[in-house]
Regions:
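Active-site-flanking beta-strand signature of metal-NTP-handling nucleotidyl enzymes
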Residues: 3-8
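Long, low-complexity, Ser/Thr/Gly/Pro-rich intrinsically disordered segments that act as flexible linkers
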Residues: 42-44, 84-104
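The conserved glycine-aromatic submotif of the RRM
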Residues: 45-50
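Short hydrophobic/aromatic beta-strand micro-patches
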Residues: 9, 52-54
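An amphipathic, aromatic/His-enriched active-site/gating alpha helix that lines ligand/cofactor pockets
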Residues: 17-39, 54-91
Length: 104
């Protein structure tokens, strides 16, 4: 399994608008091409949005990201979502070991 951890620094005062537009535009696009979003967090103190996308392997990643980039909705991403991002940090990582079982 591969994951992509993305950290966006959002323009000051735009976090709520960013989240609204992300859910309206970007999330449906990910669903359309089969890219699972496995987690997301907001650090309001740092004005950061952090999320994780998952891929089966490198070939799956390339195929799905190419399909994503070719969607006609990409113009909406740029005009409604990307303009609210001041900085973007992306890490492509692979699994190291299975998660620990929950302890009760």
């Amino acid at each position: 399994m591969l994951a992509q951890i993305r950290t966006y620094t959002i323009n000051r005062g735009e976090m709520d608008n960013f989240l609204k537009e992300l859910q309206a535009v970007a999330i449906p696009m990910h669903e359309k091409v089969g890219i699972p979003i496995v987690a997301s967090w907001v650090d309001r103190g740092q004005n950061e949005f952090i999320w994780v996308r998952r891929f089966e392997d490198q070939a799956d990643r390339e195929q799905k990201l190419n399909a994503f980039r070719e969607l006609p909705e990409m113009a909406d991403i740029r005009s409604r979502v990307a303009v609210k991002i001041a900085k973007m940090e992306i890490h492509d990582v692979e699994g190291a070991f299975a998660p620990s079982p929950a302890r009760g």
